[in-house]
């Protein structure tokens, strides 16, 4: 039987690695060390004729009664996610479901987003387009002013930005939102805690595609929204029940399984991403170094990575390392396509944040992006092997 934990996570002073392993302990129903998968869609009501209580409001119950509303595997995954994100969380069947759930709940008249073609998750734009059909939601683009934003509107900040991997200043946009009476939502998929804690930096809500680093094995489709305001999360859970976007028990089980190793994985991702980005940037900027490896440095025009940004706010936002997903602008689309297809240790595939390294010619999924751009998601292989693989293909193209 699902039940409310007897402890408050805020009282636990242990580290992330410990918390993520034990945050869901109070939800254990059996003595299994590995949580079982509960696939039942309906549950027996507890109680006797004298203790049964009629329905009043959909909220967190002390027992599950229908899988569209709650279930043990989902409860456990949310407890673990809350320990990572440092706030109450609600998990969904995908990142897009999390985005739709939050926007339908906030119901703004206007939203500021990143300009298509420059960057930003295309799925967010598609969700906004569909909400526009229902409510007339207006859209403008994020800049240093967001003049069109007013009371109750939303600034949807994605940082680091997909696909480039460059960071934006969360506290700056928090102050901007505050002055306008607006709501700041941060999509922090590219940099989950401990790399970047968007809620601590001032976001009202943080959204993640849990498919990426949080699950991290290319076998889970999930999304999560977190907020310091627990009442808002309870509202979102109630909405989720009627939107039909709860996570399937098996996916929740796999997500929880993956979260156990998240602190170890994200540290390796961060380290490897930094090393590979720095190496590629050196190839692009140090002709003598590139030549010594048999590589034509003109093949790489620019490397976009948050470790290469010089503005002071970057280090203040990304306090726990660097994002491991970033983009490289190459000499031509021909070079881009050959690079993606000829690497040994990189899968030519979309997505990011998994243990295996991925590379993508971005025109495969974004028709507005520069055809010379490739996106790399650096996995947890040995960085030296990944660098050697890249060197090999660049040398063959020189």
From Swiss-Prot:
InterPro entries in the cross-refs: Cys/Met-Metab_PyrdxlP-dep_enz, Cys_met_metab_PP, PyrdxlP-dep_Trfase, PyrdxlP-dep_Trfase_major, PyrdxlP-dep_Trfase_small
UniProt modified residues of type N6-(pyridoxal phosphate)lysine: 212
Organism lineage string: Eukaryota, Fungi, Dikarya, Ascomycota, Taphrinomycotina
Named cofactor requirement(s): pyridoxal 5'-phosphate
Family assignment from sequence similarity: Belongs to the trans-sulfuration enzymes family.
Stored PROSITE patterns: CYS_MET_METAB_PP
GO biological process, one term: transsulfuration
PANTHER family associated with the record: CYSTATHIONINE GAMMA-SYNTHASE (AFU_ORTHOLOGUE AFUA_7G01590) (PTHR11808:SF35), TRANS-SULFURATION ENZYME FAMILY MEMBER (PTHR11808)
GO MF term set: carbon-sulfur lyase activity; pyridoxal phosphate binding
Disulfide bridge partners, by residue number: none
GO cellular component: cytoplasm
Keywords: Lyase, Pyridoxal phosphate
Pfam hit, one: Cys_Met_Meta_PP
Protein name: Uncharacterized trans-sulfuration enzyme C23A1.14c
């Amino acid at each position: 039987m699902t039940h409310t934990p007897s402890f408050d996570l805020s009282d636990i002073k242990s580290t992330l690695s410990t918390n993520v392993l034990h945050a869901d302990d109070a939800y254990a129903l059996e003595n299994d060390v590995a949580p079982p998968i509960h696939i039942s869609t309906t549950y027996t009501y507890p109680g006797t004729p004298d203790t049964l209580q009629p329905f009043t409001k959909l909220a967190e119950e002390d027992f599950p009664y229908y899988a569209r509303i709650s279930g043990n595997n989902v409860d456990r995954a949310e407890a673990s996610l809350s320990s990572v994100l440092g706030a109450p969380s609600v998990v969904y069947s995908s990142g897009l479901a999390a985005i739709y759930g939050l926007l339908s709940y906030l119901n703004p008249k206007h939203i500021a987003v990143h300009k298509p073609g420059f960057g930003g998750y295309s799925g967010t734009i598609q969700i906004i387009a569909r909400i526009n059909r229902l409510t007339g939601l207006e859209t403008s683009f994020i800049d240093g002013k967001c003049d069109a934003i007013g009371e109750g509107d939303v600034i949807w900040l994605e940082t680091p930005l997909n696909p480039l991997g460059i960071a934006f200043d969360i506290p700056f946009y928090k102050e901007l939102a505050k002055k306008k009476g607006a709501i700041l939502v941060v999509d922090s998929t590219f940099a989950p805690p401990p790399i970047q804690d968007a809620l601590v930096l001032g976001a009202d809500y943080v959204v993640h595609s849990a498919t990426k680093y949080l699950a991290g094995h290319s076998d889970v489709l999930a999304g999560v929204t977190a907020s310091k305001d627990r009442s808002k999360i309870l509202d979102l859970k109630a909405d989720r029940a009627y939107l039909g976007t709860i996570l399937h028990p098996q996916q929740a089980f796999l997500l929880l399984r993956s979260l156990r190793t998240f602190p170890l994985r994200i540290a390796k991702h961060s380290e490897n991403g930094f090393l590979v980005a720095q190496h590629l940037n050196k190839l692009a900027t140090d002709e003598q170094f590139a030549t010594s490896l048999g590589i034509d440095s003109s093949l790489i025009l620019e490397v976009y990575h948050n470790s290469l940004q010089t503005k002071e706010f970057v280090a203040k936002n990304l306090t726990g390392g660097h994002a491991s997903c970033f983009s490289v602008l190459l000499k031509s689309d021909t070079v881009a396509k050959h690079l993606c297809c000829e690497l040994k240790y990189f899968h030519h595939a979309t997505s990011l944040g998994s243990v295996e390294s991925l590379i993508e010619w971005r025109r495969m999924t974004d028709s507005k992006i520069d055809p010379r751009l490739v996106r790399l998601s650096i996995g947890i292989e040995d960085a030296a092997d990944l660098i050697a693989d890249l060197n090999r293909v660049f040398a063959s193209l020189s």
